C-alpha cells in the first residue's frame, strides 16, 4: 500500500473518489482506505478502465466507511479525532503498466473538544 495523505486530527471524510487518468495494462483493482481498513473508502476500481472513469461514486463501489456499516463512522462518514492515520491506496494485482490515478477526498475539518 502507498500512503497518499496523512489525515490531520479533526477531519471528517465524507467521500473518496478515484479517477483514472491513464489506464494501466494487465489486470488489477485499486482499493482506497486507511490504516484500519484498506478498502474502507473505495472497494475496487479497475486500474485498466478508460481514462476519465471515476470510482467511489456508486453504492457498489464504496467501502464500509461510507456505507455506515461500521461502528467507527457516524452517518455516512468517518471521523478522525487524532492524528496518526494515513489514507492509503493499493493495487490487488501487479499491472504490466501502472495506471495514473487522481484521488479526490471530500470532507470537513472540526475542532474536537472531547
Where are these regions (language model features)?
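Surface-exposed, low-hydrophobicity beta-strand/loop segments enriched in small/polar/acidic residues
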Residues: 1-114
Amino acid at each position: 500500500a502507498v500512503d497518499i495523505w496523512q489525515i490531520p486530527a479533526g477531519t471528517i471524510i465524507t467521500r473518496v473518489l478515484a479517477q483514472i487518468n491513464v489506464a494501466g495494462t494487465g489486470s488489477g483493482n485499486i482499493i482506497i482506505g486507511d490504516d484500519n481498513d484498506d478498502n474502507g473508502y473505495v472497494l475496487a476500481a479497475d486500474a485498466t478502465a478508460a481514462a476519465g472513469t471515476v470510482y467511489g461514486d456508486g453504492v457498489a463501489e464504496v467501502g464500509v466507511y461510507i456505507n455506515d456499516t461500521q461502528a467507527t463512522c457516524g452517518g455516512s462518514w468517518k471521523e478522525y479525532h487524532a492524528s496518526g492515520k494515513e489514507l492509503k491506496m493499493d493495487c490487488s494485482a501487479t499491472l504490466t503498466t501502472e495506471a495514473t490515478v487522481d484521488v479526490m477526498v471530500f470532507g470537513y475539518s472540526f475542532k474536537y473538544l472531547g
